[in-house]
Amino acid sequence: MSVSYDRHEGMSIFRPPLCFELTGRQFRLVMDDGYDADLIFLDRETLLFRRAGEEKRCPYDCIKMEEQCYFINFEERPFKEPRCGVTVVLDEREGLVTVCFATLGKNPKLPRMPYTEFVFGAVEQPDGSVNPLRHGYTAEMAGTSIDWNYGTFNIAHVYQSERFYRVAFTPRALERIRRNSPEMMAGSDGRPAIRRVYEDYADFIKIRDGLFAVNLLETNLCRRNGHGNSLFFLMNLKEMHDCGRSFGTNAEGLDENYTFGAFGTRYDAGREMSLESMYYIH
């Protein structure tokens, strides 16, 4: 059983096909936090994850974004409390790995806002060696923006700086919203809600040239509406195609953890970048 449920297909129209190349293989992950892990792909649907004396058997999605580079997302089912989702970016060519741990319920004031932690590491080779290099945080994407097409809607992500992102809507996206979801055009104060510039925390990690892992949080949305998610992407900016996963809850309060994908085009977000932040002191 795939991690993704049928009800999420609208976000997954452009998701790359699931990859089964790792079936039957196992990897020893040497992690910088001192807790090494074993990642074992039992079959096309289930993996085993051993770490810090714990063993989890989980359904998973694996997506191949470049040759020998995989986006692997999993969480125990049925969901256990407190929830912990794991996403692994595995670069077999370079022997490097980045793991994103997403937990729910860590913040007592915002129990429906995920907390994310990144751990970097390397894949142990058959001779016992490990690559001394690591994936790392980067400023390469700062000052750029991309209009992402998810098939049913468009949204532009503005990578404001090394630590923040903003949301913008192109004229094409606004027209699609007017046509398909007119209720999104009006805010509670009478102003067009969709035209406000939303800003929040972000992490940008370089995996390879042109390939970036990006984590976008929705903390301000959670403060306003009671729930927000962690959106974690692996972006291939040479082909302008990404995959990702959404971890947290939906508007109905139901748990969710699913993978998706989009195609992107460069977008001039000079206006959105020039506006003073409504949320943070820069």
Region annotations inferred by a language model:
Residues F20, D32, G53-K56, E81-P82, ...:
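Short solvent-exposed loop/turn micro-motifs enriched in small/polar/acidic residues
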Residues V130-G136, G270-H282:
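Trp/Gly-enriched beta-strand/coil motifs that build multi-repeat beta-propeller-like domains
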Residues V99-Y150:
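Surface-exposed beta-loop interaction hotspot
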